[in-house]
Amino acid sequence: MWTLFTSHASEFFTGFGWTILSSVIALIGSTILGLGFALLQIVPNRFANIVGKIYIEVVRNIPLLVITMFFYVVVAKVLNLNGFVSGTIGLTLYTSAFIAETIRAGINSVDSGQYEGARSNGLSWWQAMRYVVLPQAIRLVIPPLGNQFVNLIKNSSVLAFVAGLDLMYQANMISQLTFDTFGPYIIVAIFYLILTLPLSYYMRYLENKTDR
Amino acid sequence: MQDFLQAYSWINMRFLLTGLWVTIEVSVISIIFSFIIGSILGVIRYMKVKYLSAIVGFIIDMIRNLPLLLIIFFTYFALPRIGVHFNVTVSTIVAMTIFESAMLAEIVRSGIKAVPKGQLEGALSNGLNFYQALWHILLPQAYKKMIPPIVSQFVSLIKDTSLATIIMLPEVTFRAQTIYAQKPMEIIPMFLMLAILYFILNFTISQIGSYIDRRMVS
Amino acid sequence: MQIKKVAGLTLGFLAAGLFVSGVATSPVQAETAAKNQTYDRIKKTHTMNWGVKGDTKLMGLTNIRTGKLEGFDIDMAKAITKRIDPKAKPELTQITSGTRVPMLLNGNIDAIIATMTITPERKKVVDFSEPYFNAGQALMVMKKSDVKSIKDLNHKGARILGVQGSNSIENVKKFAPKAKVVALPDYATALTALESGQGDALTTDNSILYGMAVDNHNVKVVGGNFTTEPYGVAVDKADPKLTKAINKAIDEMKADGSYDKLAKKWFNDVPGMNWKEVTE
């Protein structure tokens, strides 16, 4: 196992790098998009609410693989998107729907008296959101949001389907070169755990803290 | 437009729907198994049995933090090397069950934990032993609250069966790929149909889930 | 404090995981299967499990109308099965270039007949029958492309599509070392990727490429073959008796003309292909 690792170290680390890059881009992108769609669902405008709802329901109910493949083989005919970009876009859109739901649930669980109080003190809708509701909501949603990020890192393995150069792709390539179906996957499993385990444990710690 | 409609010929649709049936079959079996196993593991983890809970917790944490794709590869390529042989369908079911049981165990554990402490203490002081209290008091309340996360986990499971295309499970995504590889003109209609089929399936399940949730709460 | 605890827990689990996996691998490597188990099982249960392609026209392709697999490899598999054991029924399992060897070694399938080139590297892990088909690696490009041979792709920025686990992508490193290889899971995805502009060319064996070009008029095969790719049936090294039986079956088929008949059936009408050449 160790020799397998050292003889293919550059591939493993390349894969690790692409997995991290894809995850970070998707994390930032999906948080922004998710926040946008969460707000779209609660602004006092029926049309915006419906648009937000449709986006979330559609994206949430379709597999990530299908979304990614769509970008890789259909959208790429018009725009030039390689596997890494298609995969990262797919990951961003898919995760954004879950983040939107998480944030919306957080906003809803903030006591409605807070919002009404803010409004009756003369704050606009946006000010009430910005200064009263969102700061409290964000504290509530950090643990579930963290779990979404763990899912995001795990889901980045979808890049392997579209030659996205990530960890899973490298594991496949090394496995087929060496005819070893065990070692490469154990090694990438460790790489994934290095990313996901600390995040998971930290989120559980935060959850326990808020429970108390 | 003609091309577009031709893509939905009976021949193609029959091919796709056969795949959808595989998706449903694999999902339902995996849901049943992972619900049972996940519940047991979740309870074990909640109970803090010496050693056992720690070991179970360790395994659950490992599995929960790995990509499902990796677990599918493991069950299909690594398990046979220690003498366990499965065909593609069974492999997928086993991989899904392993992964989803771990996910559900965590939901069950935090669900039981969320039941107010007084409930357990009350039950114990009324003469019930721990298992009776668990079965009659804690679990029913916990499950009622857990319906939304459990249902969304099941929806995830259905979507995730598409990952088994990598080991050539002839489910609906795989079949759509087979069609559009042979008939490149039908690629957009195939993606549209895939989206529609998954949406109908998953949206229906979500709606049923929230209906049950509303009934239970009121 | 808490960060330390998280880091400690993570490290602890990783170490334990490494240990467990180390323990798990050791007996696997020591395992030696009994000789000729597969051959004896085929004779006993009258079923033979073949790993075949489902995404390559002419060789092994899923028919959408019937849901069944068909092609030269499929017909060969059926004919060989009958000659090994007249009572046996062939079971067909669809595989990809990436999954076929592990599946054979794991015992999920008894033999591979799936556009598999006999190479020295593969001979180290599996046994091959004598060659039953002579393919050669070629290039496929979009109709409007001006790429004429693999040499045109030996520059930085060129992207060559291939399939994971095929030796075609290894050959690219020899013939066009400057080009980037984009390896996809299967031929269905690779062909779609070519059409979507994910690469400048798709490379694999001419037999597979000609099959793709039969129904697809947006693409063309160019440049002729730049390697020779003799196909063989792959069998586990622990089953020399099965390899022998397969060789005997192929010889018989070549002698009594049934082999030529199959080759003619599949390749006679394919533009650009000469069935006599590939079966020499």
Task: Give a label for each model feature.
Chain C
Residues 134-141, 206, 210-247, 269-280:
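Periplasmic-binding protein-like
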Residues 78, 89-152:
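Acidic, polar ligand-binding/catalytic clefts
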Residues 74, 83, 151, 166, ...:
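Extended ligand-binding regions for polar small-molecule ligands
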Residues 48-52, 70, 151-165:
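Short loop->beta-strand "edge-of-pocket" segments that line small-molecule binding or catalytic clefts
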Residues 90-102, 147-148, 182-192, 196, ...:
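Short helix-initiation/N-cap motifs at beta->coil->alpha
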Residues 31-36, 43, 167-181, 221-225, ...:
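Ligand-binding clefts/hinges and TM-proximal coupling segments of bilobed small-molecule sensing domains
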Residues 99, 116-124, 170-174, 193-228:
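A ligand-binding cleft/hinge motif common to bilobed small-molecule-binding domains
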Residues 32-112:
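Extracytoplasmic small-molecule ligand-binding "clamshell" domains
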